[in-house]
UniProtKB/Swiss-Prot annotation:
InterPro entries: P_Acid_Pase_2/haloperoxi_sf, P_Acid_Pase_2/haloperoxidase. One of its GO terms (biological process) is cell wall organization. It catalyses: trans,octa-cis-decaprenylphospho-beta-D-ribofuranose 5-phosphate + H2O = trans,octa-cis-decaprenylphospho-beta-D-ribofuranose + phosphate. This is Decaprenylphosphoryl-5-phosphoribose phosphatase. It is found in: Cell membrane. Keywords: Cell membrane, Cell wall biogenesis/degradation, Hydrolase, Membrane, Transmembrane, Transmembrane helix.
Length: 177
């Protein structure tokens, strides 16, 4: 049987992998981001450290950790409902192990976006611009998510982050004014 040619999202993934996988440090960085974001544990640790190190901003850091966790949990729930399988094409190299075969949406992209939005609020820094693109790209480079999994994960994370901010963090800022 002839090997099927990459089309659609698979072709995008193949193009990303072809362009980036051999660049020095790219694969190692993508794997590091993957491990950091697994079950949103890196974001939870960072939020806890922020809450300890910056007591005046403790609430904002705890809200950021809670938001990342909630975003991750929602993404996992959606994965279990949708049950889309991870990319499976001979032209795609899978460059990291995953805890499940479910793909949609990317929980890494979801929790990273929520964490970046909420930690950006805590620090006053534009963290979504700095943190979200590398994590999103890493999911495609590693061959574990279709681009649509990542895009929906980013949108979901932004939505959850905004809701958590309005419920948990927004009231605190309003009182400080």
């Amino acid at each position: 049987m002839a090997e099927r040619a990459p089309r659609g999202e698979v072709a995008v993934m193949v193009a990303v992998q072809s362009a980036l996988v051999d660049r020095p440090g790219m694969l190692a960085t993508a794997r590091g981001l993957s491990h950091f974001g697994e079950h949103c544990i890196g974001w939870l640790i960072l939020a806890l450290l922020g809450a300890i190190a910056l007591p005046r901003r403790r609430r904002e850091w705890l809200v950021a950790g809670a938001g990342a966790f909630v975003a991750h949990a929602i993404a996992v729930l959606i994965k279990r409902l949708v049950r889309r399988q991870r990319p499976d094409h001979p032209a795609i190299a899978v460059n990291v192990d995953t805890p499940s075969q479910l793909s949609f949406p990317s929980a890494h992209a979801t929790s990273t976006t929520a964490a970046a939005l909420l930690m950006g609020r805590a620090t006053g820094l534009p963290l979504p611009v700095v943190l979200v693109p590398p994590m999103a790209l890493s999911r495609i480079l590693l061959g574990v998510h279709y681009p649509s999994d990542v895009a929906v994960g980013v949108a979901l994370g932004a939505t959850v982050g905004a809701i958590v901010d309005s419920v948990g963090g927004g009231r605190q800022r309003a009182r400080k004014r």
